[in-house]
Amino acid sequence: MLAYPTTSSPWPPRHHGAAAAPAARRHMAAAAARGKRRGAGAAAAEGADEAAEAADLVRFFLRRTSGGKERLVAVLDRHVKVVRTEHCFLLFEELGRRDGWLQCLEVFRWMQKQRWYVADNGIYSKLISVMGRKGQIRMAMWLFSQMRNSGCRPDTSVYNSLIGTHLHSRDKSKALAKALGYFEKMKTIDRCQPNIVTYNILLRAFAQAGDTKQLDILFKDLDESPVSPDIYTYNGVMDAYGKNGMITEMESVLVRMKSNQCRPDVITFNILIDSYGRKQAFDKMEQVFKSLLRSKEKPTHPTFNSMITNYGKARLREKAECVLDKMTEMGFKPNYVTQECLIMMYAYCDCVSRARQIFDELVSSQNNVHLSSVNAMLDAYCMNGLPMEADQLLDSVIKKGAVPSASTYKLLYKAYTKANDKKLIQKLLKRMNSQGIVPNKKFFLDALEAFGNTDKKPRTVPSKNSASKPDVESANNSGTDTSSKPNLSVWQVAA
């Protein structure tokens, strides 16, 4: 089977200003230069060069088709001499991120007409995965049947894609049943034996569904199989439980993790910090943070961002600001996500003017402000009952070239509906119409829910252990846990 670039690998830096002919000529010239290379390290350099050139060419193709300038197939036809399987694979990845599943099918049809095309499991697996993420279950199943008709024999990666596809469907109980059906079928085929990716997909899915019984069955099956769990296994399950607020179940996975001699990484610490923060178990959250600082792992931006967000939701402004101080003290420069977290924190704490000050600083420090930052400030106004200010901000950012998304309009529509401001609602709908955004049923149902919510914003009651100053300032010092849970702390797992 052909080897393809991993989906998690970052693309090389962009090259701007490339014209069509020069881009193709550069690709062919580089190929000729690679043929002349000799000496140690030539193979590694060649592989890196090939990946960079392929990514560069794919970006060029997508630039040519952006905004409906040209059809992608027409662009591929003009460069047919240099396009190969690896370029199409990269196109599938990028089009999948851009909701371009129909274009993926067009590229696939184009591929099949080329002399160099050979039916391959990797291509079908990628396409099935893309269709699944976009909810195109029938199309994914059609591709699976096409793969078998083309002479390809399904392997583990194809079945993993099928399982992931069904888990994206709306009927979760039916999806889980189908996923288990494929899992059992895989066990009966030698070339399709479940691997750790298969188990990780299923374990996370059942954790998200809160099905602890099936989760225990899968863990037992994993223990009896030749496959060994990895850090992704435990992190995936703990994250799913944590996001569902199932803290006891999350802690039981932590115990299982230690019993299998698997050391936590920074992702593990971040999951625990966020999960305890969501439940406002701040004593445990701070204990995990101290354990992180004592371990070989180092905090990351998400570590601090999560703490700021969760303290903010509990309206603990001083604690959130102490986290920011600790972050700066440790040499971390707040990124735009941190600033968005601060905007929301101050919004929860009734400090809209301070939130706007941070937003203005963010705008002045960046050439292109992320739409998520705009949405954060709009949300800050809306949750504090300031729809007029939100509308004025929207006017301002649109004049500067920002293009609101459906999520932007959704949060504003809910706020304007809650405020019963018909004038702003009409203005917003006209904007949506001019931008070609058509609201669906869910859009209006979510807005109707706003009528039932009479509070200005969620008022959460801090836990009794969270009234004091945060422990982040003294996190480097040893401390004892006064709470009864968890029975096993992260620093004990890491020991």
Swiss-Prot record:
Residues 1-24, 455-495 are annotated as: Disordered. Pfam families: PPR, PPR_2, PPR_3. Keywords: Chloroplast, mRNA processing, mRNA splicing, Plastid, Repeat, Transit peptide, Translation regulation. GO terms for molecular function: mRNA binding. Gene3D superfamilies: Tetratricopeptide repeat domain. It is found in: Plastid, Chloroplast. Residues 462-495 have a biased composition (Polar residues). PPR repeats lie at residues 120-154, 155-189, 195-229, 230-264, 265-299, 300-334, 335-365, 370-404, 405-439. GO terms for cellular component: chloroplast. PROSITE patterns: PPR. One of its GO terms (biological process) is RNA splicing. Residues 1-29 form a transit peptide. Belongs to the PPR family. P subfamily. Involved in the biogenesis of the plastid translation machinery by promoting the splicing of group II introns in chloroplasts. PANTHER family: EXPRESSED PROTEIN, PENTATRICOPEPTIDE REPEAT-CONTAINING PROTEIN PPR5 HOMOLOG, CHLOROPLASTIC. This is Pentatricopeptide repeat-containing protein PPR5 homolog, chloroplastic.
